[in-house]
Amino acid sequence: MSTERAIFAGGCFWCMVEPFEERPGILAVTSGYTGGHIEYPTYDQVLSKASGHTEAVEILFDNELISYDELLDIYWSLIDPTDADGQIYDRGANYRPVIFVESEEQRIAAQKSKIALEKSGIWDKPIVVPIEEAKTFWPAEEYHQQYYKKDPKRYQAMHKARERYLALQRFKGKFKFLRKNTR
């Protein structure tokens, strides 16, 4: 077994855990904060937008069972990559989408994946997700961990609203792509 780490930010971390955690080869998914200047940040500090941190998930995975490229594919399916100022209803820099890379190999894979998404025509606006060097990851408070199990009804409502929003955004992008290419 060869363990690797990935860190992705994509809005509220509550909606980022289950889609990764259910995959074979995933060893752990932790909700937390990264990218800021305060050590041991709390949820309230991150929410205040004064810490510089972004909500994110840290994923430990067995790269013999699931690849970093597969994780990138899952990540892109969970976010609106054209929105740099948060995701869906969660607005501000603390909810911005970011791919935090651990190595040059991850950076190259993330860049290739981003370019492929841009060329796909799925989205009608530029892909604006930055690729940044990973910094210290601070686990969030326990009540945030595996939220989908702790409050399944609320999680399902949030998850379904997010899926509907993303489906609509993708449809709008495909419709514009089709109209542009049939003229």
Curated annotation (Swiss-Prot):
UniProt keyword annotation of Translocase present: no
One GO-annotated biological process of the protein: protein modification process
SUPFAM superfamilies named among the record's database cross-references: Peptide methionine sulfoxide reductase
Entry keyword annotation includes Protein biosynthesis: no
Residues annotated as the enzyme's active site: C12
GO molecular function: L-methionine:thioredoxin-disulfide S-oxidoreductase activity; peptide-methionine (S)-S-oxide reductase activity
Keywords: Oxidoreductase
Enzyme class: oxidoreductase
InterPro entries registered for this protein in UniProt: Met_Sox_Rdtase_MsrA_dom, Met_Sox_Rdtase_MsrA_sf
Reaction catalyzed: L-methionyl-[protein] + [thioredoxin]-disulfide + H2O = L-methionyl-(S)-S-oxide-[protein] + [thioredoxin]-dithiol; [thioredoxin]-disulfide + L-methionine + H2O = L-methionine (S)-S-oxide + [thioredoxin]-dithiol
Pfam families: PMSR
UniProt EC number: 1.8.4.11
Biological function: Has an important function as a repair enzyme for proteins that have been inactivated by oxidation. Catalyzes the reversible oxidation-reduction of methionine sulfoxide in proteins to methionine.
Family, as annotated: Belongs to the MsrA Met sulfoxide reductase family.
Name by which UniProt lists this protein: Peptide methionine sulfoxide reductase MsrA 1
Source species: Lactococcus lactis subsp. lactis (strain IL1403)
Gene (name only): msrA1
